Amino acid sequence: MSITSSQLKSWHPDRPVSKGSTSYHNAVVNAPYYLENLDVLVDLVKPKIRDNETVVDFGAGTGVSAMHLLRKLKAKFNLYLVDNSAAWLGKAYEILSNYSNVKFFLLEKKEERYATLAETIGEKEADHVVCANTVHLIPELENTFKGINSAMKQKGTFTFQSGNILRQDRKKGVLMVDDTIIRVHDIALDMISSNDNFRKYRKDIDNNIEKEKEQRKFVFPDPRPVQFYLKSLKNSGFKYENPIYKLIKIAYKDWLDFLRVKRLQAGILPEIGGKEPSPEEEQDRDELIILASNQLFNDLEMQNPMADNKCFTV
C-alpha cells in the first residue's frame, strides 16, 4: 500500500515522557562536543535546503538534532522527526510539538525488523534526509538505506554522521565512542574483583559476563568500518561523496554525564543488575561506572597523546 502526503498523520505519544529519555536528553543537549558534532552536519546540509522542502531527521531521538536544524537553518522547511523509540520520540514531541512545520513518525516493529522510512512516510516524500549519531546502531543497514532511498525525491540528499565508525588511518590517540565504553566496562569488572565494597557481585560475575554479552552489544554494537557504510550506500542505489572526518574534543565532565545515563548504563555494565536493576544495584552500578570513568580519564591524561587533563579526542 502506498502513502500520499495527504494521508500522513503525525505520531502522538500515549504515555508521559520517560525518565530515561529525559536523562539522556539533558546529558547531551548542551554538551559542547555534541553541538560541535551537529554543527558539522548542519554546515553540510545548509546550502542544499530550500524553502518549502521536506527534511527528515532519521533517528531523531529526543530531538536535539532537530532543535539544531531549526535553530541554524534559515530556510522555511518542513521537518519530519523519525525514530523507532516511542520513549525517545516522546521527549522530542514534548519539546517540538508546538512547531507547525514539525511532524513526528514512529518506525513500527514488523516481526524481526522495523518499518523502513518509505513504509512510514511514503515514497518520494523527502527532499533531504539527515541522520545524526544513529547509523552505527542500525543492524540491517542496507535495508534501512534502501528504505531511505525510496522515501526520497529525485535529486534528494542523504547526509549522516557518527563518532563510532572504524577507519584505518585514524591518528594515534583518537578514540571512538566504543573505545571508552569497553575500557570503562573492563576497569569496572577489575574493581569488582579488587574493591571489597563490591565483593557481593563477585560470585556470579563470570556467569553474568557471558549472560549479558547480548545486552552490551544491543546498546553498543560492534563498530563497523567506513567501507561497510560506503558499500551499503552503493548497494542501496546511492551515489556518494568522499567522507569528511573531523576531530572533536570531549571534556571528561561532559562524557561522565553521558556515561551516567541509566539506560546507557544497562549496556555499559549490565553484569550488575541487567536491564532491570534493583535500587541498590542501580546505585552500585553508577558508582562503579563513575570510579572506572575517572580511572580511564586519568589513564588518558597520562598516556594518550590526544588527551590532556580536561578532555580527550574522538
Say what each PLM segment does.
Residues 127-141:
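A short SAM/SAH-binding and catalytic strip from SAM-dependent methyltransferases
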Residues 56-58, 62-117:
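Class I SAM-dependent methyltransferase SAM/SAH-binding core
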Residues 1-50, 64-68, 88, 108-113, 159-201:
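Conserved class I S-adenosyl-L-methionine
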Residues 20, 241-303:
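C-terminal helical/coil "lid" or tail adjacent to the Rossmann-like core of SAM-dependent
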Residues 115-129:
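A short acidic, Gly/Pro-enriched loop at the edge of an enzyme's catalytic core
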Residues 142-154:
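A short glycine-rich, Lys/Arg-flanked "PGG" loop and its adjoining helix->strand segment in the class I
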Residues 221-236:
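Short alpha-helix
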